[in-house]
Amino acid sequence: MKKIILIIITLFLTTGCFNYLSLNDIAVVSLVHIDYQDNKYILTVEIRENEKDNPNASSIYTNQGITLDNTFENIGLTINKFLYLVDVDTIILTENVLNQKLETTLDYITRENYIGNNFNIIVSNDDIKKITKLIKEKNKIVGAYIKETITNDYNNTIDIKYNKFIKTYLNEYKDMILPFGKIVNNEFTLNDAIIFNHNKESAIINNDYIKIYNLLNNTNKYSLFKTNYNGGNLIYRIKDVNTKYKYENNNINITIDINGNFNEIDNINLNKDNIEKLITLTKDSVYNETTSFLNILKNNNIDALGFKKIIYNKTKNKLDSIKELDYNLDIKIILDREETIFENIGAKKNEI
């Protein structure tokens, strides 16, 4: 990653960008934290240090100003370097920014051509000093660490790059969702998410609902469904999912095909009858959790799944609210046996 950044910077320098600034004049930014208090922006940035012995060395700087441009400039003047944000990894917004200065902040980030658009954007109200301290104690670049946490397929998180987020923000047919970070037991976690209604914060959902959101968006994250059977515990792990939507007569028909395997089995005899019952229980679990999440969206008129766009494409009519919509769920659970051997069943897949 460091080599890639160096190559990109070199290209800019050799093609006349930055008014022929040298490498020593550029501060490569990994993290930006934006808060808004008392009519001022409070900006914190993490700058990568060019240390051979410690590639994860970084420094944290904070300043404030009346405008974002003024605040970025203040930090640049403090360190006497040009802030290079083309490869920024993560931008954190506080709820103060969401509720008071979201439009202004997004307009600035989008219009400034020296800020990249492939970074992850999250929300957090925790003290940025505590967040950076906890992550730097792991000898990690803070912005890169948060981005890696989000994008890792084994972490059930909301993975939203800025370019996708801004398209949703400008889209009247779909509501936004963003990861919500907080410190839990001295760890910075991303187990929650904020969902919006017409660009206004509406609700915070937990990791169980994030799992359902990813499933409904065909996002193959590490997702587990737990059920109980005859006093034993069963964990079904999703390997891949295929979700489709169809609108008919004020109904959104949702078809979910899930392929996965039993990741953990506790005191359960895996004969053919039990396997069929376990798959049925897993299907019921997915159905109940999905229905619960859809009801949250419907009751709060949150169109995080883009139902208005589906309806518009079918009818050319703009829907003001999704509260009157009905949902039909058709869930198919497929047991993939590539990683598990069942002696009494010869077929590769069992479907119910």
What label would you give each PLM region?
Residues M1-I4:
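Positively charged n-region of N-terminal signal peptides that target proteins for export
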Residues I8-I352:
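Membrane-proximal alpha-helical signals and transmembrane carboxylates
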